[in-house]
Amino acid sequence: EMSASLVGSEMCIRDRGEIEMSIADLLKYTLQQSDNNACDILFDYQGGPDAVNKYIHSLGIRECAIAGTETAMHEDLNLCYENWTTPLAAAELVEIFRKKPLFPNVYKDFIFQTMVECQTGQDRLVAPLLDKKVTVGHKTGTGDLNAKGQQIGCNDIGFVLLPGGRTYSIAVFVKNSEENNQANSKIIANISRIVYEYIMQH
């Protein structure tokens, strides 16, 4: 069942107590609001991080490791470094999602639209493109501070649909940053702007 209404933007699953929820709602929570509880429920549904890791590798993405759940990483921040990928591999995964027939179009279209309606990270990849005639779908990731006071990760991956049918996928990761989340988000926005301007000029 992939039909579901949009969820409230200020509520996470933890706030809702014991309820039944569709896969569609779980995907909306995790893709649009980066809800870690929804992420872990989906991990469990798919057989755990190792099963998801094997699936990603089966798609041809090798520079990627999914070793722990969100709950495990919050309990031990060092585990955050066990879950990793590269910006190129992440962008390749977005390209595979957009261009290969991984699953029926109804599910693909649902995930596509859910990413377009992402509610987090409006100051990241999307920021320099808000006044452009483009469609942007993206998914953010925001890490905690490590023992040195550095932000472990400030990330955004997504796709951009340009007028005339051209498209591109992009991933920007800021790791172990001494800056705050706002500054790191601005770094991502600046890179997004540079990439957009380059592509529009070529």
Per-range role (PLM):
Residues 73-82, 133-145:
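Carbohydrate-binding/catalytic loop surfaces
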Residues 16-25, 67-75, 120-136:
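Charged/polar, low-hydrophobicity segments characteristic of intrinsically disordered regions
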Residues 1-8, 12-13:
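Single conserved hydrophobic/aromatic residue that forms the stacking wall/gate
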Residues 44-49, 92, 96-124, 128-134, ...:
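Structured C-terminal helix/loop/strand segments within mature extracytoplasmic catalytic/sensor domains
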Residues 4, 137, 154:
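Short glycine- and Lys/Arg-enriched binding-loop motifs that mark or flank ligand-binding interfaces
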